[in-house]
Amino acid sequence: MAAVAVLRNDSLQAFLQDRTPSASPDLGKHSPLALLAATCSRIGQPGAAAAPDFLQVPYDPALGSPSRLFHPWTADMPAHSPGALPPPHPSLGLTPQKTHLQPSFGAAHELPLTPPADPSYPYEFSPVKMLPSSMAALPASCAPAYVPYAAQAALPPGYSNLLPPPPPPPPPPTCRQLSPAPAPDDLPWWSIPQSGAGPGSSGVPGTSLSSACAGPPHAPRFPASAAAAAAAAAALQRGLVLGPSDFAQYQSQIAALLQTKAPLAATARRCRRCRCPNCQAAGGAPEAEPGKKKQHVCHVPGCGKVYGKTSHLKAHLRWHTGERPFVCNWLFCGKSFTRSDELQRHLRTHTGEKRFACPECGKRFMRSDHLAKHVKTHQNKKLKVAEAGVKRENPRDL
């Protein structure tokens, strides 16, 4: 009811001020309407006694009636009025409403002035003044305050919890000491052997780099240049951007580190030992007979087939075990094969590809063995023609 009374009082005051002598020169100076308007204007003053039927509250422009958006008054309006406005625009005769603080606001309720409205909305329609629906969920004690985006505005002590807490600083990068390397007999086949490595050193380069940057009490296992190169590599892995001076400082160390990795990468490629009887009998040493080509024998009893490559022997062993890991993914097919070339040959039956062409007649075939049979037909024809020619020459010679 108090809000309705304030709205009615505001509308009545606007209606009466439109008919004051300053706005209507035809009315007399001491007319009853002028006296009533002066009495109503003193209601909001600090020293005046408020009417018992109305609740004295600070003036809020957002509660004004739509008629308060336009004020076609003259410039001689008294400035002591609480609703005093600046002179109207000379061309339009319309004056936008200004934001001001009421005397009834206490020191604890003083808020920073709201920013000026957007030029495209001059009549108090800025998004700062018109609160969105999400502000209704805030408690009544939280008054809206304007905080600019570019500046760090100071908030009252009671509103500091509205801002999000600052992010914690990132932890400093630390290098952890890795576990010691296993014994040389337990090293996997992909490990990298290093000359002069102690029992506590690992064959993997990353382990040595991590141990080098671990710091005391462990002594570094690389010289000072390699340790600096490791620090530069760690900085690059963390995503840091090196400046011109930093890049010039670490450039030589990075180049030295890359040069030391080149011979290690050459020895990193090693094959798993073949478990065929021939390789097991020879002790797995390929340099025992360098002039002889190494052969891999099938260890299944009663087979004894020999292959020149370990991949061929593995494919043959899959034939013994019945394993078919290569499956056709064509729709409604699902056939499986022991070897990958068998699967590729089967896929040509689905696609219709004929990649083998006859050099004599140009006829194409899906399989190479079919082409070989077709080429033999051409060779047989040539032999028959040659034999027929020889038989014809023999009667003439007689």
UniProtKB/Swiss-Prot annotation:
Motif 9aaTAD positions after renumbering to this chain: 187-195
Keyword Metal-binding: yes
Signal peptide range in chain numbering: none
Entry protein name: Transcription factor Sp5
Zinc finger residue extent: C2H2-type: 296-320, 326-350, 356-378
SUPFAM superfamilies on file: beta-beta-alpha zinc fingers (SSF57667)
Region described as Disordered: spans on this chain: 160-215
BP GO annotations: bone morphogenesis; negative regulation of transcription by RNA polymerase II; post-anal tail morphogenesis
UniProt keyword terms in alphabetical order: Activator, DNA-binding, Metal-binding, Nucleus, Repeat, Transcription, Transcription regulation, Zinc, Zinc-finger
Family stated for the protein in its record: Belongs to the Sp1 C2H2-type zinc-finger protein family.
Predominant cellular place of this UniProt entry's protein: nucleus
Comp. bias intervals (Pro residues): 163-174
Species, as recorded: Mus musculus (Mouse)
